[in-house]
């Protein structure tokens, strides 16, 4: 198969394997999304949600998020080719054609929606589809190349997984479920701007208006600190609504303190006139993922053990 015009050549085998199609789904990105889905199911059930439902939601959730990743790679294949981090993706390298990728991504989304509708709840299916459309249409097609608010608004796509899990168990969405949505919404800029600071030159070269590219490092670290504060405040509010107890509260305080501490280290480093270095940005980037994972675990354990 000859790579399409304008797409770089590759020394890799021309026949795509199942591993290449798996790479289209962005499995590393999906792991944290799926984690918030499954832990939200335990929170909603206040116990074991059932093996069958866990399997269905896990598979359907992966396929829906994977489908979004596929269409993101299709749309962004021109800029992916020009960025070191993404140049070898199957679509940008020409290993998998746009047509084949679109068929694969579409099939994943249809299967996901059908599985959730039939074996979970219709609301879970709609929430999953909403997340897909937010990521592909709102973020990738509209915001990513046009505004530095891309991560803030488009990041809402990553907030839907816990709603999917909650709706799969209960068939509705209460206020606590929307708090889970809001926590991820305000957490997202902290996580992705820490990454953007490290690869802002690549974003600049391909014309993506990430915050560090448009407004510089100082405003970026200030915004990271602000969103970290929002995240921590939101994380403890469900305690005062009676949705979670002392175990979650203590966990949220400790985890939140560490998130603020790492944000402060990055803020102080940049405001002192230093260039962003991996040794100060990477700890925040990596810890932010651990923070979200453990916060959701704390919520699940608290509601399961303490009722």
Swiss-Prot record:
Sorted UniProt keywords: Cell membrane, Heme biosynthesis, Membrane, Transferase, Transmembrane, Transmembrane helix
Root EC class: transferase
Any Pfam family hit: UbiA
EC number: 2.5.1.141
One GO BP: heme O biosynthetic process
Pathway stated in the Swiss-Prot or TrEMBL entry: Porphyrin-containing compound metabolism; heme O biosynthesis; heme O from protoheme: step 1/1
Reaction it catalyzes: heme b + (2E,6E)-farnesyl diphosphate + H2O = Fe(II)-heme o + diphosphate
Membrane topology note: Multi-pass membrane protein
MF terms (GO), sorted A to Z: protoheme IX farnesyltransferase activity
TM segment ranges: 29-49, 51-71, 101-120, 124-143, 151-171, 179-199, 218-238, 239-259, 280-300
Protein name: Protoheme IX farnesyltransferase
